[in-house]
Amino acid sequence: MSKKTGKKKHTFFIVMAIILIILIAAAVMLMTHTQLIVGAIQNLSAATVNTKNLYEPLGTPMEGMKENGQYIITEIRYSDRFPNSYLDITYPDENRLTSRPTLIYFHGGGFFGGSKNIGDPLAGSDATSLLDDICAEGFNLVNVDYVLVPEYHFPDPLIQVNEAFAFLMEHAEQYYLDMDRVVMMGSSAGAIITSQMGSVITNPDYAEILGIVPTLKAEQVKAVVLDDAPLVYDQFSIGTKVLVGNYVKGSIFLGQEEIRKYNNILWVDSNYPPTVLLGSEYYIDMRSMHDALIEANVPHELIDPLAERNLRMPHCFVASERADAVAKDAFDRMMGFIAEQVK
């Protein structure tokens, strides 16, 4: 080999090494500063979904009948402490004096976007029609907004929704809400909140490590519905680690204590509320919760189309219950379970 050829190869390897070092450095930067990625997603999503933390309501407050005959009150301010502290209440009809159980719902959106008005930008189905259909089954439905990254992180949304519970307790008579028959439900990120609040309310040790004094008592929460909650951090894909890691600390590299606080499956005991688990994209997490609930002897139902039908369903598939037979079956099973718990 000539000296000239050898020199060219040497130069090539140096250039490739430099490029590799730059790529590794960029990857490390992104993985330890995840808001760079999530912020870009927020910017791309901002035209269609809420990605902001706002002290003013997203919409004009209104009260009255919907086209489907349900009665709604929107943009009720439940706290002055955090932005996005608004909720809507929907009743099956205008007769609000009828005693009905209360279902409190938290939307998804990776903690970077979404709202009670629109739902989850990461789910491919219509969460708003799902809520109408739940309400039509005889529930007063409370749809709650909460804070987003980058200004707020875990456990801020839990602290905030605890304030929403306090507001609902204080104003239960005003809004004709039965706060002794409560069901909590969430989809995706909202399912994470729901799952964790289930432990905050029923396990004093978990509440203590998060610094939360729960407003609701365990006996008030008759059931929880976890719609595809990513909870087992070590089993996440890199994409989910970016979203959840960003929510927890702004990095995918969570310590064991941070994971221990985040994954409330580790804190499930016999006092955890009766539970519906809907598993699709995060079926592994829902199966892990299923195992914990079995060990704790907690009544629950796991709805897992992959295990039951060998079908891979999309994230939060139950929201497609108007158009898809598998989703409709899941909806019917979910509603049947929680109806039994609120009797």
Task: Label every model-predicted segment.
Residues M1-G6:
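Juxtamembrane low-complexity tails/linkers enriched in Ser/Thr-Pro and polybasic
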Residues K7-K343:
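Alpha/beta-hydrolase superfamily serine-hydrolase fold, recognizing
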